[in-house]
Amino acid sequence: MTFANALFPQPEAWRASRDETPAGGLTPMGVHALDAMIDLCGPIDHVYCQSFRRVVEIDSDDTTSILLRMKEGMSGYLGTITATGPGFSLQVFGSAGSVRLEGMTHVAGAPSEERRTRLFGTCKFQPVKGQAEVWEAEPYDVTRAALEAFAAAASGGPAYPIPVEEMIHGAALTEAIVRSAGSGAVEHVP
């Protein structure tokens, strides 16, 4: 999974502070990609992260690479780059083929009734044998859906769609990644 987002924040912005955004693009945006990986692949038990500043002039890393080892034996990679143009892709490989999702778009600044977020624009399934299937995802306001689900759960309605255990694991995973970025070592995720 890769995530690029030209944040280039002003020096006084919270995203420009290493204390507020450890491991570069991980904390402002990459955590959402980690949530998707946890949802698809289950808990992650070990991580290795390298994170450094190559281009930006603020006190924050712009290039972060994370290797993940899932409890079920799978492996994963998350890269975040905050010094390039925006982009997002997720690719999952299996014995029958692979699926690639890419092209997250967000119409920022549009009135709420016009704003639409497309989590993934193009979806492509490539079987090991046979022709690829490609389709476009429908626009969907992800932020609005998340806030509505939270409000419903807080009001005694249906439970929030992300299990609490996954949320706690995501926080522990983020902490382990930040530790690895600082230590330069593989870190266990409790």
Write out the residue ranges for each language-model feature.
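Predominantly a Rossmann-like dinucleotide-binding segment in NAD(P)-dependent oxidoreductases
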Residues: M1-Q50, R54-E57, G184
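Glycine-rich phosphate/pyrophosphate-binding beta-alpha loops
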Residues: V31, G79-F88
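A short, glycine/Asx- and small/polar-enriched loop/turn
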Residues: D59-T63
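C-terminal hydrophobic helical "lid"/dimerization subdomain
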Residues: M167-G182
